[in-house]
Amino acid sequence: MAKGGFPGGFGGGNMNNLMKQAQKLQKQMEDMQKDLETKEFETSVGGGAVSVTVTGKKEVKSINIKPEVVDPDDVEMLEDLVLTAVNEALRKAEEETASKMGKLTGGMPGGLF
């Protein structure tokens, strides 16, 4: 490791260069976050019986339930379908966020940003 530098040459010991890189990375992360917030993630379960759309902000935007799955004698099944669909849509949003963040910060020590 170079004296005063970071593993892999990040910054190369030049504090001014390191600050410029950090500012550039911060701007890229902000842009990526704005882009993700406008994206929508949809999933459906039960053969399309229940579909859910969430935003990149991880807010539920819509839940669609086909009338034929509404059975007053089996509310628990419908609850399970809705829960599964919501969790799957949120998982997709989280995976996309983690993937993009990983590409942007790849190789940096954890907790740096």
UniProtKB/Swiss-Prot annotation:
Biased composition (Gly residues): 1-14
Chief place where the protein resides: cytoplasm
Pfam family, one: YbaB_DNA_bd
Region (Disordered): 1-31
Subcellular location: Cytoplasm, Nucleoid
GO CC, one annotated term: cytosol
SUPFAM superfamilies assigned: YbaB-like (SSF82607)
The keyword DNA-binding belongs to this UniProt entry's keyword annotation: yes
Keywords: Cytoplasm, DNA-binding
Keyword Cytoplasm attributed: yes
GO molecular function: DNA binding
NCBIfam families, A to Z: DNA_YbaB_EbfC
Record's function text: Binds to DNA and alters its conformation. May be involved in regulation of gene expression, nucleoid organization and DNA protection.
Subunit details: Homodimer.
Family from the record: Belongs to the YbaB/EbfC family.
Protein name: Nucleoid-associated protein CLL_A3446
Organism: Clostridium botulinum (strain Eklund 17B / Type B)
Top-level taxonomy: Bacteria, Bacillati, Bacillota, Clostridia, Eubacteriales
